[in-house]
From Swiss-Prot:
Possesses two zinc-binding sites. The zinc ion is necessary for the toxin interaction with MHC class II. Interacts with host MHC class II molecules composed of alpha/HLA-DRA and beta/HLA-DRB1 chains. The lineage of its organism: Bacteria, Bacillati, Bacillota, Bacilli, Bacillales. The keyword Disulfide bond applies. This is Enterotoxin type C-2. The gene is entC2.
Length: 266
């Protein structure tokens, strides 16, 4: 074998190794949505206040708790009290599958998530479509407590850039005390800021036609959540929040977040 052929073989082998052992970033990334993929606020004729409620200071937050029960194989029930409005003292969080529920079943965890009441079931005896007193439900929102906090109670700032009609109009930071934080927690904090500063959701509608929040991880993978309700005259909070049931977490030090909004007259 001559020298040039030998070098070519070495390069080919090296390339094959890269293909086999390098993670395929593109395959795991969620492409940016096309305009047709996004929900449009003008096509929602219900009360936007029901969406606003999910992100306007109404969320479950607890530290160092353990599950005390379950209803189905893929959920966990916690003794968490609503210290603000006294609406509940039990919280059920539903996860994507049984394996994910088992992962956190006997762990000391922190819980942070948006919650709902209608169609929240803790047993087969609960009435369909009714509110179960003293109880609330959510999806995901779980992180292990041990070793997941910064020293001396320090907080991590996470930068969020907002683009309106493709132009960066504002940037702001939200804070978390967790090293590995759920995307849900950061989403809630981002939307809460935008509700207060940009009127993201009003009682009847929104000044924005479309919106999505995009997470960019350190390895280049991306994913996003649609920020507007589906078309129609009814908004199902439970169905909307189901997007968090995979309990997706990100590294708070490296994650980048973008919010993309289009105005109705843009």
């Amino acid at each position: 074998m001559n020298k040039s052929r030998f070098i070519s073989c070495v390069i080919l082998i090296f390339a094959l190794i890269l293909v086999l052992f390098t993670p395929n970033v593109l395959a795991e990334s969620q492409p940016d949505p096309t305009p047709d993929e996004l929900h449009k606020s003008s096509e929602f004729t219900g009360t936007m206040g029901n969406m606003k409620y999910l992100y306007d200071d109404h969320y479950v937050s607890a530290t160092k708790v353990m599950s005390v029960d379950k209803f189905l194989a893929h959920d966990l029930i916690y003794n968490i009290s609503d210290k603000k409005l006294k609406n509940y003292d039990k919280v059920k969080t539903e996860l994507l599958n049984e394996d994910l529920a088992k992962k956190y079943k006997d762990e000391v965890v922190d819980v942070y998530g948006s919650n709902y009441y209608v169609n929240c079931y803790f047993s087969s005896k609960d009435n369909v479509g009714k509110v179960t007193g003293g109880k609330t439900c959510m999806y995901g929102g779980i992180t292990k407590h041990e070793g997941n906090h910064f020293d001396n109670g320090n907080l991590q700032n996470v930068l969020i850039r907002v683009y309106e009609n493709k132009r960066n109009t504002i940037s702001f930071e939200v804070q978390t005390d967790k090293k590995s934080v759920t995307a849900q927690e950061l989403d809630i904090k981002a939307r809460n800021f935008l509700i207060n500063k940009k009127n993201l959701y009003e009682f009847n509608s929104s000044p924005y036609e479309t919106g999505y929040i995009k997470f960019i991880e350190n390895n280049g993978n991306t994913f996003w959540y649609d920020m507007m309700p589906a078309p129609g005259d009814k908004f199902d909070q439970s169905k909307y929040l189901m997007m968090y049931n995979d309990n997706k977490t990100v590294d708070s030090k490296s994650v980048k977040i973008e919010v993309h909004l289009t105005t109705k007259n843009g």
